[in-house]
Amino acid sequence: MLTVTPPPTLSVILLNWNGRAYLEQCLYALAGQSQPASRVMLVDNGSTDGSVEFVREHFPWVKIRDNGGNIGFAAGNNVALREDDAEITVLLNPDVILYPDCLAALSEALAEDPRIGIAGCRLLYPGGDIIQHAGGFLTHPQAMPGHYGIGERDERQHNMPRDVEYVIGAAMAIRRSLLDEIGLLDEGFFLYFEDTDICRRARRAGYRVVYWPAAMGIHIESATAIKGSFAYLQRFHSSRWRYLLKHFPAEEIAGPTLEAEAKWLDRLNPAERRAVTLAYLATQRGLPEIWVARERDGGDPLPPEAQAAVDQGMTGLIARARSAEFDPSGLERLAEAGVLREQPFISNIPLVGAIIAGFRSAWNNVASRWYVNHLMTQQNNFNRMTVAQLEQYEAELRGQMELLEEQVVLTVELRRRVEKLQAHVTELRRQMNHRQG
């Protein structure tokens, strides 16, 4: 008698933050899968758009976990991952609509080879004919991400499975045994690069990360943050620097990375530069914890001198970013223009021009020079005092801007701590209600 091996158990974690507009299509697509998930959990990060109420009313088969606050992508998913016991877990964004065979294809991918720890999808832009993601890669020395196939018309040119550096967390399948070995998502990433990080850790542990083209979906990619916005740039580059400091070799960070970053920084517009400055400040403030995370997740420890070099390099980048906010030659030009100088008399009349100019000069010496020179001296003194005062105001403004930037970083850090505390309180209340019930 032929024995049929059942497919591995598979669950879906759907992390949501104010994604109500996308949930209906996303959940209907999950309900229509050829291989349904054994469990679908909506993890809500404190939405205020009625997401939880909508799902509870219209999709009662979805298990709901309300975190009570926006604790980020990694921490939010980890809440569900700690409870999950399925052999395969699919992390999914609300703005992704899976094709009917997507979960079956992801299950097939991990069944193909026990060394495959993570599998990702072929994701298309709305319309279904343009590729958004067919596996990812990072450029060196700055850890800028790229996507295979992005912007290409899907003509099955990326139709073969392949090992890649990373797949994006909008729709990725993770083997449970991998998480048991390397740990959960790094909660130091609030948003962005947490998927790249866990793929790097998986490959370091000897697992494969694969792009699996049979697993397909539409990624609307607009539910979380507007690309190019100040908040996006700040979060993206904070996470980018956390990633490269966790995983890049010390000699690359201290040399090519800092050098390339400085040149890249000079090309940014003022708004982008301000956002990146905050990312640098947050990174520098978090360096002690990042070095701990680097060793915890299997990276080579950085010796103290290398850590000091990175710290010094970050200070240099911050200073470079801030200096570009002011035109250093502006006050110099103003000071030069503010000096009044006596102009000689000139006449362009042929033959007698020099005589006329000499007469005017002589008359000026007798009639008005004594008075005009006095006024010029007064005006020059006033102009010098004005420029000096402006220099003082500029220095004070620079100082206030630096304090404001540091306060913004501290405020963001404090807000995240408060959100995590709210999530802990919500979880304690849930446990108390469960025991009392």
Predicted feature residues:
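Short active-site alpha-helical segment characteristic of glycosyltransferases
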Residues: 195-201, 217
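Acidic/His-rich active-site region of diverse nucleotide-sugar glycosyltransferases
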Residues: 69, 75, 79-82, 97-98, ...
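Short beta-strand/loop segment that forms part of the nucleotide-sugar
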Residues: 38-46, 65-67
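Conserved donor nucleotide-binding strand/loop of the catalytic core
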Residues: 52-83
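Short, acidic, metal-binding catalytic loop of nucleotide-sugar glycosyltransferases
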Residues: 28-37
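Terminal low-complexity segments of carbohydrate-biosynthetic enzymes
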Residues: 238-239, 260-347, 351, 386-389, ...
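Active-site-adjacent helix/loop segment of glycosyltransferases
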Residues: 124, 204-288
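Short aromatic/hydrophobic "clamp" motif used to bind/position activated sugar donors
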Residues: 89
